[in-house]
């Protein structure tokens, strides 16, 4: 009996500790977000950028934060970083009309007219561009529950309509599971990078005195093949490749699946640039 009481007290204390920490974290997030928004409103875009970045580094990032950060960069005249943050936001909220408009508007400012080609798999699974990883995961989880529920019911009621329902759910379960797996793989292996500097030389090798093959400009999206000693080998969709300083590019997916939004369901304030 005493052990049970002690265990209950310990569990209660842990829950209180976690809840209080979560509340404090939420307060910090709200305060930082408010400061960033206020700075943006008065035109202090650099201060807004620093506050949004502080939120992201503390683990409070999300689609809306990346979106607002992209807008702040755009207003501050940093086109490359604006496109980088818009692309990151699009991984989390791909159907957002304001984001898609602003990203398209920012892309129109890029000097290099390079169109990204789509492979056969991307074209075949075209709908994946409209869903983020979380949406696909929870859709798959829900269909999995429905599938098991119908299988259990069919143990006792083998009716014709349940059979067709089972086939329908099974098909949707398979397609959704495959879609989630492909989306996870694509994000995990997303090697797209954005040129962050006004103009960069693409060299034949990872040395300052190597031959300049061509130039790329701020906001251009290319692919990173590998990096070594502060240099990155990048590739264009037309297969042209060369070396550039790693500090001149920004990786869109950061090499890992992006699945989360902000951990605190607070109202977000958005700042369209159009």
Predicted regions and their residues:
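Boundary regions of SH3-family modules and the immediately adjacent low-complexity/disordered segments
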Residues: 79, 163-197, 204-207, 211, ...
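Conserved beta-strand/loop element in small beta-rich adapter and peptidoglycan-binding domains
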Residues: 210-228
């Amino acid at each position: 009996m005493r052990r049970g009481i002690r265990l209950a007290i310990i569990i209660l204390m842990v829950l209180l500790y976690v809840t209080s920490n979560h509340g404090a974290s939420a307060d910090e997030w709200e305060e930082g977000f408010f400061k960033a928004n206020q700075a943006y409103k008065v035109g202090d875009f650099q201060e807004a950028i620093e506050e949004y970045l502080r939120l992201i580094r503390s683990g409070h990032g999300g689609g809306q934060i990346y979106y607002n950060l992209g807008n702040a960069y755009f207003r501050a005249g940093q086109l490359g970083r604006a496109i980088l943050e818009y692309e990151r936001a699009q991984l989390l909220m791909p159907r957002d009309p304001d984001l898609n408009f602003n990203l398209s508007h920012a892309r129109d400012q890029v000097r290099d007219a390079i169109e990204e080609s789509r492979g056969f798999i991307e074209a075949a699974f075209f709908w994946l561009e409209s869903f983020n990883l979380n949406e696909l995961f929870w859709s798959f989880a829900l269909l999995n529950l429905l599938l098991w529920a119908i299988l259990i019911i069919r143990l006792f009621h083998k009716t014709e309509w349940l059979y067709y329902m089972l086939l329908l759910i099974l098909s949707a379960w398979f397609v959704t599971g495959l879609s989630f797996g492909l989306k996870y793989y694509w994000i995990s292996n997303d090697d797209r990078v954005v040129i962050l500097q006004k103009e960069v030389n693409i060299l034949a090798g990872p040395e300052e005195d190597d031959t300049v093959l061509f130039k790329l400009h701020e906001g251009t999206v290319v692919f990173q093949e590998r990096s070594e000693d502060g240099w990155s080998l990048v590739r264009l969709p037309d297969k042209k490749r060369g070396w550039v300083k790693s500090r001149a590019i920004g990786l869109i997916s950061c090499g890992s699946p992006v699945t989360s939004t902000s951990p605190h369901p607070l109202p977000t304030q958005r700042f369209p640039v159009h």
